[in-house]
Amino acid sequence: MPYYMYVSLQDDDKIAVFTMDARTGQLTPQGEVPVAGGPSPLAMSPDRQVLYVGHRTVPGISSFRIDPATGGLTQSGTIAPEAAPTFLSTDRTGRYVLSAYYQGAHAAVHPVGPDGAVGGPPIAWLETAIGAHAIQTDPSNTFAFVPHIDNRGGPNAIFQFTFDPTTGHLTPNAPPRVGQPPGTGPRHFCFHPSKDLLYFSNEQGSSVTGYYFDPATGTLSAFQTISTLPPGYEASNTCSQIQMAPSGTFLYAPNRGHNSIAGFAVDASSGRLTAIGHVATEARPSAFSLDPEGHFLFAAGSETDRLASYRVNSDTGALTPLETYPVGKRPMWVLMTHLGG
């Protein structure tokens, strides 16, 4: 089964394409695709046939058909939203592209055509607040969350919505926000693969917070916050993305400042996190990804223009450094997938 990696290079106006050896984690360059306008956030359609790209320097969202034999990209559509998207995702059906706008203070839903191409005006263009940093629907595809960081006027809150998968409309849930302790700054989040739990990375708080998710009401309640930093570290740091292993046994979050990947073991019963340590990585790791099986992890340094690779210990979750690859200027997103059946 072919494993592919897409790395957006915002300051090179390119997307780099790699294949990964499933046994060794070795990456092999497959070429670069010119993408104007500062490509940054990436998202994949559920059928893995379309890649969606957010443009940061010239606001836009584009769709690219994926060649399943080569991983190559062919642009199929583009739209120009009112602001530059910070985050993209699709709903669980793949009929809609959802986007969050950090500086634009909005969340949006865009329709896609039968071939997955973007085009036309948004179905929803909702004013939220400065600092909107992510948006995803829950596994039932009936609720959505938009975390807002605690910086530059951000409200330091998670906005809760109901989502209509028939129309694509977002409606504020009750309550509409989940407030945070001062200095937390929820940024990105991931779902537990088999439990009603969510985990948010906290940008300003340099921490991860676990939440119980009520699948009937679509609301969240926190049960744990744990630091992503080692004891005694007091220098400047912000937390970026977050990802859980497909098995649900380990969770990872990068530190920008400490320049490390923090690892956590996930309790099989309660979902509570226990720190398992840190591994040094490239400077300012804004983006990272596990491979689809959770055997390897790749972290991009947006200040070094390199990508560091690690092997994941399946028993402990510990990361063993492997190779470092030059990728291009300002890597801002790492997306891994397989294109097999």
Model-derived regions, located:
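An edge-strand/N-cap motif at the start of beta-rich repeat modules
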Residues: 1-22
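Conserved beta-strand positions in repeat-built beta-propeller and related beta-rich domains
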Residues: 7-10, 53-57, 98-103, 138, ...
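Loop-centered beta-sheet repeat module
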Residues: 145-207
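Blade-loop segments of beta-propeller domains
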Residues: 29-94
